[in-house]
Regions:
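Histidine-acidic metal/acid-base catalytic patches
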Residues: 43, 101-123, 127-209
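Residue-level detector of anion-binding/catalytic polar loops
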Residues: 1-2, 45, 84, 180
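Conserved beta-strand positions in the central sheet of alpha/beta enzyme cores
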Residues: 4-7, 48, 86, 147-150, ...
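Short hydrophobic interaction/assembly module
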Residues: 1-17
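Active-site-proximal loop/turn and secondary-structure-junction residues that shape catalytic pockets
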Residues: 7-12, 51-55, 89-93, 125-127, ...
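Generic short alpha-helical segment signal, independent of protein family or function
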Residues: 1-4, 37, 205
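Active-site acidic/histidine proton-transfer and metal-coordination neighborhood
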Residues: 15-120, 130
Length: 209
């Protein structure tokens, strides 16, 4: 059994990573050090980071540069222990308006700029279907920086086979590419009770055949 990414930082209401504010940077350092110790206790390799809200009053490229600088600082704290920060782009249309990080190409650009084995991407297929689609080509383009996947169908964010995403093809594709990481079931169930639990199991069996 492998523990998937735990949430280390995901304050949706704060302009955090996009700033140069010294107090924010000290807060992030503290969070990273706490995260490293938590990961050691539970034996976890990945820690999820959402870089917070974007700043309406600051040019976008400056925000990107600030995010990169802050993540470099965070990655330096995590590297000695082997903890990997995984950035999660989230959709702005259905669930999380106002956030800085929304797309896989954007996360890829940031990870490449940070240039650390402790800064990677968790590709949430549900969110990215809403934000950009083009799922398999984006997986291929960002492959070197993807450390984990979150799963859920769209619309509805229930188990695979309940929406429009072809998980069977996605699973085949990442298996062919040699993926051996975690697949995190971050979704609800289309049915309640025991029948709903059976439906989830059957859905994954169907997609993994």
């Amino acid at each position: 059994m492998t523990i998937g990414p735990f949430v280390l930082y995901a304050d949706f209401g704060v302009k955090s990573f996009v700033t140069r504010d010294k107090e924010i940077r000290e807060m992030l350092k503290k969070r990273m050090n706490e995260g490293v110790e938590c990961a050691k206790r539970v034996g976890c390799k990945w820690a999820l980071v959402v870089p917070g809200r974007f700043d309406e009053g600051l040019e976008w490229d400056y925000q990107t540069a600030n995010v990169i600088d802050n993540l470099k600082m965070c990655a330096e704290i995590c590297e000695p222990s082997g903890l990997v920060l995984v950035l999660e782009p989230l959709n702005a249309w259905t669930n999380h308006p106002g956030l800085f990080l929304t797309k896989i190409p954007q996360a890829y650009q940031i990870c490449r700029a940070v240039g650390s084995p402790s800064c990677k991407i968790v590709n949430d297929i549900y969110h990215q279907q809403i934000t950009e689609g083009n799922l398999i080509p984006n997986i291929d383009m960002a492959w070197s920086e993807i450390a984990a996947f979150h799963l859920g169908d769209n619309p509805g964010r229930k188990e695979p086979t309940t929406g429009e995403i072809n998980y069977k093809n996605i699973f085949r594709h990442i298996k062919k590419k040699g993926y051996e990481g975690v697949l995190c079931m971050e979704h609800g169930r289309s049915k309640r009770g025991k029948e709903g639990e059976k439906a989830v199991i059957e859905a994954y069996r169907a997609c993994d055949s």
